Amino acid sequence: MLTIVRGPVGSGKSRYCREEIIKVLKEAPLGPMVLYIVPESATFENEYLLNTREDLPGSFRLQVLSFSRLALNVVREFKAFFKNSSEFVYQHTLKKILQENKGKLQILQKAADNPGFIEDLLKLFKEFRRYRVKPENLEKASSEIENWMLQQKLKDVYLLYKLYLEKFGEEYTSEGLLEKFLEYAPKSKFLAGAKVFIDGFYTFTPLELEVIKTLLKTCAEVTVTLPTEYDPGIFNRLYSEALNLGIKVKELKLEKIERYRASELLHLAQNYYPLLPDPYSGSLENLSLIAAANPLEEMEKAARIIRYLAKFKGYKLSDILVLIPEDGYYISNIKTVFNEYGLPVYVDKGLAFDHHGLYFLLKGVLGEFNREAAINCLKSGLLNLTADEVFALENYLLSRGLDGEKLVLKEAWEDPNSSYWESWEKGFGEIISFSQILPLINTYREFSQSLKQLLLKIGVPRRISDENGERFWQAFTNLLTEIEEVFGAERLNPTTFAEELLAYLAKLSLKTIPKGLDQVRAGGSKRYWTGEARAVIILGAVEGKFPSPPAAGLIFTEEERAKLKKVGLELSPLIRQRLKEDNFHVFLALTRARERVYVSYPRVSLTGESFTPALLVDWLKKAFPNLKSEEGSYGNETTPQALTRLLSREMVKVKKNGELPFIAQGAFNALLLSKPELITKIARAFATNPGKIKLNAGFKEFLPSKTLSVSRLETYYSCPLKYFLKYLIKAEEREIFTPEATEIGALLHGAVAEIIKTVREKGQKLSTLLAEDLKTLVYQAFTKAQQEYGEKFLATYRGRYFLNRLYLMLFKAIEALAYFEGFTKFTPFGEEIAFGEKERLKSPVFEVNGEKYTLAGKIDRIDVYENNGKTYLRIIDYKTGSISISLDEVVGGINLQLLTYLLVASENKELFGENLVPAGAFYFRFQNPMLDEKAEGLSMEELKEEVYKNFRLSGYALKDEESLKHLDSFYAQNNKFKTVNLRTYKDGRIDNALTPAELEALFTKIKGLITEAIFKISAGEFSAIPYQLKDATGCRYCSYLEVCRLEEQEKQYRVIPRKKDPEVLLALSGGGVGDEKLDSRTNAGYHLQG
């Protein structure tokens, strides 16, 4: 007998099955089997639901099974041959079949080399078996299809599928098991007289329908449940099959929807399918639409909702179901977020092998042995090294730039007798030996056995202590054994095979079951969820994620599948049908809860990509006109981790009334890790000043020393939070060897200083040296600087290549400096001259609120020229990067260094004399300029002139004729400059030339800026307010973006007006901007060190 139970979602179809099962077992605890067949993902939960029923008598009759587990039980009853190869063996065998028959393929020959083609082909073959497609069906279809391209593709697929089945036809994949079930079921005692309940399905594949047909012929009674909202012809097919078999059919309709305790949820269930649903006018206490800034905030809101429901509404955690998109971010992070809120959660996803240490070890062992491979091995935690040794060795490898052959050469290490080398030998001796023999391996058996032996020698099984690790180890060793058994003495390319094996392991996952009973359940909306939930929370309701778009057809396009269907070759549903299925999944998600539904969507991704709410959101607003998107928070925070996360983000939001503090997300976490004692003070500061963004006076003890550098002050004006993280928290990136600008700069600065010093001490001039002498001088200075600053560059080929480039850059720069020296009366006074406490140059002292702060730094080069009792000063600062400077940047505080150095030098009258004239401050850029096509046809001298134009000094000069003509003698004769970037006009104007009054006004402004920065730093003002000057911002190239993570719409910029130099000077012409007001506010003062 066949009973078809039909009814809408929530009408109690599953409850009917369970009640009937209990009724049957109560009537007869002994007898034929009672089988409850449900989707694979629901077997555990349904078994638990039935076995925890107090009214269920003990019985051996009941089994809760999936279709494949049912088939397995029947096949085992006959002790039939059973073998199930791994997915990897299927893929690799299919790859070998493709390689051997590639020349016979017409259409798929080129596609065979595409990444993922093997996986797609294997999925297609599994689809064939589910839909009972045999090679002869493909051959028949190819003769009936008129389209030549499809005809040839069918012939290609026919050939490969035929060979695949010859290899694996007898193996029991899940599809193969069902086929074997059809063979053994009619003779099965296990099924004889059984009562079967098939529940939780809304459609069946042809193979599953054939299984049901066999059950009808074999078992006493079969009951199938079907939803009325979605029926792709299944009811009629079951009905007609039963009638054809002469089996009585009973239809039971459950029309009353009993699930919902909230009227709005009942309205939702009854009105989902019409495009224009009836509007609901009642209260909306149990239906919520939530908008979040991003997926992370969305998950946190969900966690707070769950805490609220558990604390105030009496929900058990198992009463709550969270449905999430099946893309990586939600699946990967929801457990971490919920755990921070003290919520145990079962996430319906497999255990990913590539998250375990064993994978990292294999990745290091099987790939090319280099620094990255070594670090992967260290990350595994499976080497014979302590945690301290692993940490120290990883940092050593990264900071020293050791790579390639240098890793295994003892003499290449900085100190071969140190503990680093001992740790290296202890941890990597066996791995290095294996990496040397790996390319020599010839067969699959050798590969498998050698890899097993290595892992045993390292002691991997002893160090895997976690339950998941043991499962991964067992799965991997089983795979190696299978490879050895299946492929044995066949020859292989070990490098290619290792890459293929790693690619497979990266996608491998193991099934999980819930470890606890009272925990939140989370997973994809397309999964079958057993039983009713009191509350459902849907996350990620945006287009393209909820529901996820249907996958494109594999190998065959949608158009080709439609043509195949016309000639009788039925495969999985076309996209139109799959879209209907997806819509039904959305409906199931919405109607799973009996009391509350929360639908949530993020506005943007964590990378700033905008999202469009899903069609579901629009439908809900039509069905419930009073439903509004809620932006607020939910519940109270009770865990320290959650509170820290919440505080850090709430501080970056700016309320419309401007009351909320503005500080970057992640600052508190950084504080907690670096200086726990700061947390209390920060909390107290914000608690006592909720409307401000200042840390209280107690923070002065944690401020850096009262000696400040100009570059630090520029950092503060770039973004106060950046200053806070870099200099107070001292949050640093791990040291990794790369030719950074700081190291390049140190090497070049050191070499130039050595050259200028050598020439000055010998009483010579660069401009008078012969070309060979200049070359020798540059080589000697570069070699010396390389020993002091460039040792790391020698560690790698890339580093040595950079050294060669730097040498050429230095030589061209010295040639340019020598050339420029012939046009100026200024001569070097000193190189790398420091100012500050006990330094050659006295430092400015700034008094702020009774505290003294000293400026310190180092000037790359000071040149002087003496004439008529006056001493003219010129500052040169060497740069390896951009050398642009404008006065709006100076008064904005982000480019203070050059003119501040001139200010410091010009106030050291004890050293240079009373009649001191600041003649100018300039950048000189190290570079390797290239000439364009305009240079064709120029003489050698003209080419040199073109090259030297690129090296001209860039900055500001004093607008004083006496000073200018000695600064560049070419100007005195030609009224234009050759060595500096000053541009002259016929009316006497000179760009970048400042009158003494203008220069003095700039100096006053700079003093005010330094004073104000000191005041704000000492007052604890570290808000996340980066500067913005036209398109440039303080966030550009910032190392702390991952800590800050301010959303673009949340940023509050300190806008520096874009002004030309004359406009800035005009604004300063009144004697500075706001200096008197500043002094009044900060009680500031200024003087030179005494």
UniProtKB/Swiss-Prot annotation:
Required cofactor(s): Mg(2+); [4Fe-4S] cluster
Binding-site positions, [4Fe-4S] cluster: 719, 1035, 1038, 1044
Signal sequence extent: none
Keywords noted in UniProt: 4Fe-4S, ATP-binding, DNA damage, DNA repair, DNA-binding, Exonuclease, Helicase, Hydrolase, Iron, Iron-sulfur, Metal-binding, Nuclease, Nucleotide-binding
Pfam families: ADDB_N, PDDEXK_1
Entries under InterPro entries matching the protein: ADDB_N, P-loop_NTPase, PDDEXK-like_dom_sf, PDDEXK_AddAB-type
Binding site for ATP: 7-14
Transmembrane helix listed as a keyword: no
Cofactor note as given: Binds 1 [4Fe-4S] cluster.
GO biological process assignments: DNA recombination; DNA repair
One GO MF term: ATP binding
EC number(s) per entry: 3.1.-.-
Lineage: superkingdom: Bacteria
Protein function: The heterodimer acts as both an ATP-dependent DNA helicase and an ATP-dependent, dual-direction single-stranded exonuclease. Recognizes the chi site generating a DNA molecule suitable for the initiation of homologous recombination. The AddB subunit has 5' -> 3' nuclease activity but not helicase activity.
PANTHER family for this protein: RECBCD ENZYME SUBUNIT RECC
Further facts: Despite having conserved helicase domains, this subunit does not have helicase activity.
Subunit structure: Heterodimer of AddA and AddB.
Family (UniProt): Belongs to the helicase family. AddB/RexB type 1 subfamily.
Name of protein: ATP-dependent helicase/deoxyribonuclease subunit B
Organism (species): Carboxydothermus hydrogenoformans (strain ATCC BAA-161 / DSM 6008 / Z-2901)
Lineage, highest ranks first: Bacteria, Bacillati, Bacillota, Clostridia, Thermoanaerobacterales
